[in-house]
Every structure is written in C-alpha cells, then in structure tokens.
Amino acid sequence: MNVLKVSSKSNANSVAGALAAAIRDFSEAELQAVGAGAVNQSVKAIAIASGFLAPSGIVLYAQPSFEAIQIDGEDRTAIRFKITSQKI
C-alpha cells in the first residue's frame, strides 16, 4: 500500500494529486502525519482529493489511527489515515 508522508510544509494540492493518483491506481492509500500542522495538511489534502475524484464517481473514506514510529532514534506518535474508495 502507498504511504504518503505529509509534513506541515507539504502543499495540500500536491498531496491531493498524489493521493488521487494512488486511489486511481490502487483503490487505497495511506497518509502519515506527525504534528498538528501535518495533520491539518493531510485533512485538507483528503478533502481536495475527494473533489478531484468526485466527477469520476469515486467516494473516499478516511479512517484515522495512531501509530508509534521512530524519527532520528526518537519514539514519536503519528496519525495515519487509511484512505479507501468506492465507485458509485
């Protein structure tokens, strides 16, 4: 499964484009975010990607979860959004 890592400096439109492409190719993807700014950009990207895919009849569903990760040897908690889709 595609895991797209999102930071607070990520462009939401760029992430949305990558997310929409992953959904078209694989029907599912994941976004991983650490920190409030990154989570904000992720949520905006999901909303934008939903708009990109709606004309094709594709609906997105997002399931958030916590995930323990390591960054530079430090334990951190990430928010992971599992994105699935359904064609209607």
PLM regions and their residue ranges:
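Active-site-adjacent beta-strand anchor residues
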Residues: 32-33
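Short, low-complexity, polar/charged sequence segments that are solvent-exposed and flexible
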Residues: 23-26, 49-53, 80-83
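Low-complexity, interaction-prone regions
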Residues: 1-2, 88
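An N-terminal amphipathic alpha-helical segment
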Residues: 2-29
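Short, hydrophobic/π-rich interface segment
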Residues: 36-62
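C-terminal edge-of-domain segments
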Residues: 54-88
